[in-house]
Regions:
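N-terminal active-site segment of His-dependent metallophosphoesterases
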Residues: 1-82
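Conserved beta-sheet core of the metallophosphoesterase superfamily
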Residues: 211-285
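Active-site neighborhood of phospho(di)ester-bond hydrolases with catalytic His/Asp-centered motifs
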Residues: 11-13, 67-72, 100-107, 160, ...
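A short C-terminal boundary segment appended to hydrolase-like catalytic domains
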Residues: 3-5, 282-310
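Active-site-proximal segments of metal-dependent phosphoesterases and phosphodiesterases across multiple
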Residues: 165-173, 189-234, 241
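Active-site environment of divalent metal-dependent phosphoester hydrolases
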Residues: 16-20, 76-79, 107-115, 164-169, ...
């Protein structure tokens, strides 16, 4: 694909694929217990496989989508059975070559320290995180992030903000090593000549409530802003909040559009939260158009929906 071509990117997030075969009593004797209870009494009823499959089918059947990004929380409890089911979803339901799909983890994918330290996410989805600049990853043992995928006029940069936290805490962190690597990536000639699309699960903008910001926000957001400050334009794509939204992050040289996708599997009365996906049209000048598609009440088709500015 030529660098001056248009690219269309589909954005889905927070799949929360349900596959609890490995949720044995012994493996629930940690943070997973609160998560399992939440699933049993609430989340399992809100997140539905038929909605998730409808999203995959709608994207797969479109002929104008060049690339797909998934911004985290593919699982619920970071169990092997969930990772295997999420991989099968990408392989079989979405059905696109891994070079056309970029994924990053969310806090649910690093739900326990064991899942995090064993690099369960990275091992499962390695094909969906291959980098066109393999030396760009943070200088840490077995680090796969950040990765870079050069697609026409776009440089897709995958970050992880997923770190294990205590029960009831869902905050994220980029970390010093990743920030150093990101700084070098943004200065790379192949990236500087393209429009950067940065994937991170946690949004840069914190919740208005100070307690929610502490429990659910991005801990080193100001350090990330410092790295982005010299970039004149770009796109920050996130999930985590299960809500469509659009904001701006100003930099010294310009701004980033910060856009969130709702959960692809969520059934909800709020139209801004109902299952769906976003689509972005990008050319060599930057973001041309952003639109969303929402699952209708019958669960049979997707209709255009606004991405609210908040």
């Amino acid at each position: 694909m030529l660098k001056d071509a248009h690219v269309k990117i589909a954005h889905l997030s927070d799949l929360h694929v349900l596959a609890l075969e490995d949720a044995t009593p012994a493996r629930l004797m940690n943070k997973r217990l609160t998560g399992w209870l939440n699933l049993k009494f609430r989340r399992a009823h809100e997140h539905q496989a038929y909605a998730l499959n409808a999203v995959a089918r709608a994207i797969r059947e479109r002929t104008d989508i060049d690339h797909v990004v998934v911004t985290g929380d593919l699982t619920n409890l970071a169990l092997e059975s969930e990772f295997n089911a999420a991989h099968a979803y990408l392989r079989d339901e979405l059905g696109l070559d891994p070079t056309r799909v970029s994924v990053i983890p969310g806090n649910h994918d690093a739900y326990t320290r064991g899942a995090y330290e064993s690099h369960r996410f990275e091992r499962t989805f390695a094909d969906y995180m291959s980098s066109d600049l393999p030396g760009a990853a943070a200088m840490a043992e077995n680090s796969a992030f950040p990765y870079v995928r050069l697609r026409g006029p776009v440089a897709v940069i995958g970050l992880t903000t997923a770190v294990p936290r205590p029960p009831l805490v869902a905050s994220g962190e980029v970390g010093a090593l990743q920030l150093l690597a990101l700084h070098a990536i943004l200065a790379h000639a192949e990236v500087r000549s393209r429009f950067p699309v940065i994937l991170l699960h946690h949004p840069w903008h914190p919740p208005a409530n100070p307690l929610k910001a502490r429990l659910n926000g991005l801990d080193d957001r100001e350090a990330l802003r410092s790295v982005l400050d010299s970039v004149p334009r770009g796109l920050l794509l996130h999930g985590h909040l299960h809500r469509r939204m659009r904001r701006q992050l100003g930099t010294a040289e310009g701004h980033f559009d910060a856009i969130g996708a709702t959960s692809a599997s969520l059934i909800h009365d709020d139209p801004d939260r109902m299952s769906g996906f976003n689509v972005y049209e990008i050319d060599e000048t930057g973001l041309v158009h952003a639109e969303a598609f929402r699952l209708d009440e019958r669960g049979s088709r997707f209709e255009p929906a606004a991405i609210p500015s908040v």
